[in-house]
């Protein structure tokens, strides 16, 4: 494997005959195009060709495609995908910039008192919130992810780029037989999406980082499958993303039966099919790097700030300072013990780890 061997028959009786026997592989190279042109003339007579020497020559001018290039789907865009590359701008932040600029233009003629009520840190006072990349604030993260779903993709009422597996009209989640048609005609409100997601997170006891992972999977689905989020499919798309995120990134066992208990009109087989199709549409790419996760976290903070959503801030006092020092000490101890097992720790690190001090006021 790795080389292409071509069989060349050299007849002695008729050296001008350029006929080939056997099967010819369909390739875009000139060699196989010429061979295909010779086959049009017809099949050579067996008596005209005498037994000759058979030589095997390795094709040097043939272009060998890697196996990953052959399996790469053609419908994936060539531009960097934000769910795969941390340097690419996220879709929800890029599409929400237009709304932010329009809001700023409207606020130019108005005197807003919002910035007067905000608290800022100074040399003597420091205000901190409870949201960090490893442990984001649950409520603010859910609201930001909901904004990233409803504002970024601009849910379309007449979206034709959708799939039947996500259509709620074909696969309803509730037991209500009579669903108003107006429910599927108008874009979902922010409160409706937030209530739906918060119910899932409370029932399954998920933390805030699962919301960020779910949003990454949603962007990956929209980019890979080239579909739109519309009023008829947003619930099943969000459900599939949360289901996949909880299964991949949770340390505990998660069963589809647990999600079926939240919806009375869905069976385990339907939930399995939803998960299977979601994985297939994202090409089974469920891995997320730390840089991509951090990019989504900070872009969500920017999106929340642009829409007037702020995490509750607290004054840094002695008790909170000691807690921060304890958390940092725990991280340092993790680094210390992991480095001690590997035998890669310098003397300077031992000196710094003996007594860690915090600047208090």
UniProtKB/Swiss-Prot annotation:
Pfam families per UniProt: Cyclin
Xref: Gene3D superfamilies: Cyclin-like
Entry-linked InterPro entries: Cyclin-like_dom (IPR013763), Cyclin-like_sf (IPR036915), Cyclin_PHO80-like (IPR013922), Cyclin_Y (IPR012399)
Record domain Cyclin N-terminal: where: 204-286
Any GO CC annotation of this UniProt entry: plasma membrane
Keywords: Cyclin
GO biological process: regulation of canonical Wnt signaling pathway
Keyword Glycosyltransferase annotated: no
Signal peptide (residue range): none
Disulfide cross-links: none
Ribosomal protein keyword on record: no
GO MF term (any one): protein kinase binding
Stated family: Belongs to the cyclin family. Cyclin Y subfamily.
Protein name, UniProt field: Cyclin-Y-like protein 2
Organism: Homo sapiens (Human)
Gene this protein is translated from: CCNYL2
